[in-house]
Amino acid sequence: MQPATQLQFTNHLSPNGQCILQPPPTPSLPDKMEKAPPQPQHEGLKSEEHLPQQPAAAKTVSRHIPRLRAVVESQAFKNILVDEMDMMHARAATLIQANWRGYRLRQKLISQMTAAKAIQEAWRRFNKRHILHSSKLLVKKVRAEDGNIPYHAPQQVRFQHPEENCLLSPPVMVNKETQFPSYDNLVLCRPQSSPLLKPPAAQGTPEPCVQAPHAAGVRGVAFLPHQTVTIRFPCPVSLDAKCQSCLLTRTIRSTCLVHIEGDSVKTKRVTARTNKAGVPETPLSRRYDKAVMGPSRAQTQGPVEAETPKAPFQICPGPVITKTLLQTYPVVSMTLPQTYSASTTTTTPHKTSPVPKITITKTPVQMYPGPTVMTKTAPHTCPMPTMTKIQVHSTASRTGTPRQTCRATITAKHQPQVSLLASIMKSPPQVCPGPAMAKTPPQTHPVATPAKSPLQTCLAATTSNTSSQMSPVGLTKPSRQTRLAAMITKTPAQLRSVATILKTLCLASPTVANVKAPPQVAVRGSIHDNPPKAKATMNMKQAAEAVKASSPSCLAEGKIRCLAQSRLGTGAPRAPAKLPLEAEKIKTGPQKPVKADMALKTSVAVEVAGAPSWTKVAEEGDKPSHLYVPVDVAVTLPRGQPAAPLTNASSQRHPPCLSQRPLATPLTKASSQGHLPIELTKTPSLAHLVTCLSKMHSQAHLATGAMKVQSQVPLATCLTKTQSRGQPIITKRLIPAHQAADLSSNTHSQVLLTGSKVSNQACQHLSGLSAPPWAKPEDRWTQPKPHGHVPGKTTQGGPCPAACEVQGTLVPLMAPTGHSTCHVESWGDSGATRAQPSMPSQVVPCQEDTGPVDAGVASGQSWKRVWEPARGAASWETRRNKAVVHPRQSGEPMVSMQAAEEIRILAVTTIQAGVRGYLVRRRIRVWHRRATVIQATWRGYRMRRNLAHLCRATTIIQAAWRGYSTRRDQARHRQMLHPVTWVELGGGARVMSDRSWVQDGRARTVSDHRCFQSCQAKPCSVCHSLSSRIGSPPSVVMLVGSSPRTCHTCGRTQPTRVVQGMGRGAGGPGAVSRASAYQRAVPSPRQPRRRDKAATAIQSAWRGFKIRQQMRQQQMAAKMVQATWRGHHTRSCLKSTEALLGPADPWSSSQHMHWASSQHTHWPGI
């Protein structure tokens, strides 16, 4: 608004004392008045000199006053004021709208930001929960890996070294249902400080060795302190659940030893403690003793031709086992006072017939005079034991009896006695005599057959920890001491003192009825030309006593120990090698005699991948248990047929080591025609019972004579024909035992009959899966022959056309049909490939063979197997590519049950991950939709609320504006309507016009006319012209046309009105009086102008007052509106978070100037 011109009037006194208002000169006026000097208002009498000038000044002022008043009171000036007010209101409305739009925008942004923050917070909470859930899963996984030992019976409590927890990673438990071994559950035996462990220098060997000489009742392999050799056995068995895995540092294999693969194996510290006999024993041996001493039943007598798989294979740091010195110990009749130079059996009566021990290490290994496959080794031959042809009567129950009951029994828990190569040492293999030495017919080949010397395994001690007296002739009831020992072993509290108890019990009853085995049962072995033949007969009870006598220390807790065996020449004891594997606990029952004619005509050369760790012992102590261990089946040539020596039978460095060795001589008597009635023993299997790795890992190879190790060609898949007694036998692959475990999970421990009838019945229910219809019964239990092997020679040839690389074949150690020869191939690297080809003539182990299966433990282990693929298992594509095909349709092997289970687990994991991802994505989508709905609802609510506030504010503003406009219009209307009042005539007189007269002394409006120039101060010229003269009232009535006219000042269009004039009335006294009265009332134009001036001043003052009053009202209304808006805006800003976004009143500065200018605006009081 433009600042209004402040008119200041000064009062000038005229000479007559009249106050004259004189405004100061205003340059902005259009008429540009001259400047007049201001004079004091109350000026006294002046001198006479100045008197003439004052009237002139007064005259000049009076001449300019009308024009100033006319300008101030002109309609143009008023229009300017109105325009300024309109502009002010327009600006105010614009500011209000802009502020409202900004407020709306800020509210929208705030709502969006709030919604975004809510969404982000929700997402953060979800992500946190997801991370916490993942961490919980990881913790659960770690806990599952740490505590993956399922519930074990009290007798299965494991005592571990405190340093076991510091190993690399937890073992992968094996599913008991599948009976499939894991890939990293072997133990790296770290040598403990023991008086029996001696450095190689003490042994007189230039190179370090991993194998310690075997002594009666001693099992295990000890790593010398200077050796750090990580090994992996072909058939690893789950040891303690706390066993850790480590990477192999060297890959060592030898023909005599089982495959040593460069892969992850389990390491475990085995602490040796001295038992009561003063001989250090390892916890493994103690556990072995406990497991073996469980239900010890005297088994029927029979020749033993398969080494017990309890002895771990010996490991040499070098790939080729050289310098294996053959040390023969003369075997004397089995008597209790017999002493073994390297016997580790504590509290075992010394026996006079030492057993030849072989040490398959780079140190000068003392090897028993069995044909060994050691090449590049100048065998040291110790005096060969006199025992070559021995008829081993079945000794006491193999379970509770240590190896010391007889030389044959002694070899049960440790590795097979392997004689060195005949080509190297020309010494025939020696069979350790059984407790009852029966002279076998001289069907022994001389050791001249360089590599074809028969196994040096005491077949009487075949099944380690098992009462596996082969082909028992008669069932003998186990002694009470044996049963008592079995009961004692079930007590966890006596795990550590069981050795002493067993010793005391076993030494109590020395006499037992003498039992002799028929000549068919006699064990036949190739005899050296020099050593004499020794026969030792011993009754079953004495054998049992001998077993018990030696077992307290050896079998106390099923641990395997290898005591240093001093050679006969030097007498230096060898350091006992601690078995890295945990001995399996087995219970044996009396085995029924097996018909010799039904037995297969093949001798068993058992090569065991490793001793499995049994996690559960059979519930009933008296129930027999079947022991199944992966074994290498080697077909022995018919007697009298020499086998070609294998010179480069050194260890191949390929992980799957295939022992291709024809057995040099059948280990059975000529009358038995190679039938080896194997005593069937059943061992409670937890996860790898079917794959129970016996301790006679590599010695079976040595005992089998010269054998060739081919690492890359699976022996089981090569169908070769061997002639045993002139009959070709097609070697077959036995079906993986873990498949049988699935089918026989609910079986109980039963005694398997070794007869052909029993074997046919036992495996009849599995014939549909194991052996196809075209498979012949005799083919099911035939022994696979090495690749390229012919009866007369041994070749190093590659795989047969049908051969395919298979890893992890599991076969039972003892077949129901007698001694089912089988071959165990090396397991794959880290379990990467576990598919096992099922050849057309595979035989599935019977339900009785696989042993009892704990469903709860199996399920728990199978659940824990879910995490196994993450620790080195093959990828999904690798397993998926192994399609299950029919053996006749494709040469590829059938996928094993374990691989199929892993594939299923991976599939289930993938499906679960997909489902979880889908559920999470769907949940997030639902959250987004719900957030959108919430945001939309909130925005709608805010919009409606703001709209309601806006409507209320608008209503208030509009009401205020309408009131203001109405009041302004009314004021303007009142100002434009100035009624003309006539002077009241005398009483009773009436002014007669057409219809209106002033009667009863009342004055009435004569005319409502308002001229077009009514806005001006001076009267209308028309009205003035029509006004009545003195004595003559108006008599002319002006009739206006119908066309409207618009005022040039107010801009209103109004119709023309009739100006009522005073008509000439009738003559008479009334008229005269009326005219005189009118004449008095109407001022005369000749009156002095003084009155006119006074009236003008009064009117102008009144009008100024009215205008100022209206202005004050308008200002008050504007202030009210502005205050209302400011309060509303401030409250809105305080309610929101936008109070700090900017100034709440952006137009405060201009408003302040406006109010300042308006407050100082006032009208002159004239």
Swiss-Prot record:
- Residues passing through the membrane, by range: none
This protein's UniProt keywords: Developmental protein, Repeat
Subunit details for this protein?
Interacts with calmodulin.
Residue ranges, annotated region (Disordered): 1-56, 431-450, 769-797, 829-848, 1145-1166
Q: Which SUPFAM superfamilies match?
A: P-loop containing nucleoside triphosphate hydrolases
Protein's name according to its UniProt entry: IQ domain-containing protein N
GO BP annotations, alphabetical order: spermatid development
- Purpose of the protein: Essential for spermiogenesis and fertilization. May be required for manchette assembly in elongating spermatids.
User: Which Pfam family is one of those matched by this entry?
Assistant: IQ
Domain named IQ: which ranges?
Answer: 89-118, 907-932, 928-955, 952-979, 1091-1119, 1114-1143
Residue spans with biased composition (Polar residues)? 1-19, 1147-1166
